[in-house]
Amino acid sequence: MSNEDLKLKVAKEAVKLVKDGMVIGLGTGSTAALFIRELGNRIREEELTVFGIPTSFEAKMLAMQYEIPLVTLDEYDVDIAFDGADEVEETTLFLIKGGGGCHTQEKIVDYNANEFVVLVDESKLVKKLGEKFPIPVEVIPSAYRVVIRALSEMGGEAVIRLGDRKRGPVITDNGNMIIDVFMNIDDAIELEKEINNIPGVVENGIFTKVDKVLVGTKKGVKTLKK
């Protein structure tokens, strides 16, 4: 069974949590994209009244494609946010997100939801946060040099994320740059705050406020809770 099959299993299970009348946070990434598709199918088939709040331009375009009505945080609170992750620490359910460069908008929606549910396949589970992925840090462009210096002084190895199909740095939906920092994570809660306290940092990709993780495995979907 491929990772894509496991992601689809999780997406189908997650859609069952959606009830008529809910406002849903629509995450970004491959698993979140499958969830958006399955949610659109369920809304159409069951004639549900469900609204979505997208966490990125990509999520917005997918929601429009699958005819999910969209609203904003200015108008509504979020009942449940569904989002993916680059890696999940099994014992704490702390996450690293932001491989797609959308972690600022994701965190705004996810942290302000009544419930934050993470959707992953089993390959995303790690024993220690930071095992596979760097911490993405969104930075105001004029501050990139001083932010890199501050992260280096904290013991990190910081590099500007460059575009795959363009010259120069990746630019986020907010018009900012991404710095990827490789560093030891002993206290994720404290490090999340510490990085955000650096002047010029918009937001980082450590997520510590998670309610539930749905994990796609070859034996089925398992639920992890704190």
Swiss-Prot record:
Enzyme Commission designation: 5.3.1.6
Any single GO CC term annotated in Swiss-Prot or TrEMBL for this entry: cytosol
GO biological process, alphabetically ordered: D-ribose metabolic process; pentose-phosphate shunt, non-oxidative branch
Gene Ontology molecular function terms on file: ribose-5-phosphate isomerase activity
Pathway: Carbohydrate biosynthesis; D-ribose 5-phosphate biosynthesis
Listed InterPro entries: NagB/RpiA_transferase-like, Ribose5P_isomerase_typA_subgr, Ribose5P_isomerase_type_A
PANTHER family per record: RIBOSE-5-PHOSPHATE ISOMERASE
Reactions listed under catalytic activity: aldehydo-D-ribose 5-phosphate = D-ribulose 5-phosphate
Superkingdom to which the source organism belongs: Archaea
Record protein name field: Ribose-5-phosphate isomerase A
Organism expressing this protein natively: Methanocaldococcus jannaschii (strain ATCC 43067 / DSM 2661 / JAL-1 / JCM 10045 / NBRC 100440)
Gene from which the chain derives: rpiA
Binding site for substrate: T28, G29, S30, T31, D83, G84, A85, D86, K97, G98, G99, G100, K124
Active site: E106
Function: Catalyzes the reversible conversion of ribose-5-phosphate to ribulose 5-phosphate.
Family in the record: Belongs to the ribose 5-phosphate isomerase family.
SMART domains linked to this entry: DeoRC
